[in-house]
Amino acid sequence: NTAGKEDEDDKIFRVNPVKDPQVTYYNFRGEVYPDWAKFGLTRSNGARGHQGIDIFALPGTDVYAVLDGKIVDMYVDKTGYGLNFYMEVDPKELEKIKRKNYKPKLSAREMDYSSNYNPDTMQIKYIRYCHLSKVNVKIGDTVKAGQVIAKTGTTGNASGTHAPHVHFEIAFEMRGRGLTNRVDPEMYFKIKNGNQMTKQEIKIQTEAAKTEWFEPKGYDIGFRDKSIFLEKKDDLHKNEKIIDKAKNDKNLKKAELKKIKRK
């Protein structure tokens, strides 16, 4: 009974990278394309790989440390992953939350591991968060599972997207071209696919897809205490408008709205 096995996996306590995680239902251009968000050869009709998973998040959404760990690298890639960082975790703790019965479901192009992965010699121990607008930690800091460590954004090549998200990776080496050194985050975290979302969740993503979400023009990286953030000259984020439109949907329950309400 596959469903029963999945239920057993669900009993394991996990801290998700954002609350109630779901894949982006739309792609960068605003087209319905949940496959675009997934790990594997899911881009350009299978010709190009995607080395993580895109989790829908309006800019400014809290990002959580999924396990205890240490911040080991952080930088800004204005033409790629924007403001991003790596966290090193205990491989044994990561293994404890692995979904033993998970199988890719949405597309035949999804993959579990990159082709260079050898489970006998390689330890999966890095977590990466990308396209952020603010980071509350610095390299060398230790963090606890459940700690708010960043805010989502649209920095790097996510600027102009119709599908705001946090790009989330799990890896056995920090660097790697394409899918190299990466594994499917869904083997560890349950992230809703398009066919698992509620009508309200799809409604919110549909409203978000009507907007091009640009990173603030002329931003600079600022430092204050332990916080790294984007100094915004023109804040083009429109979270409140998306929420207001969603409020007008008579079928949208208050409980669903709270999931995205800006803190």
Feature names for model-found ranges:
Residues 85-88, 139-207, 211:
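Conserved, short, structured surface segments that act as functional micro-motifs
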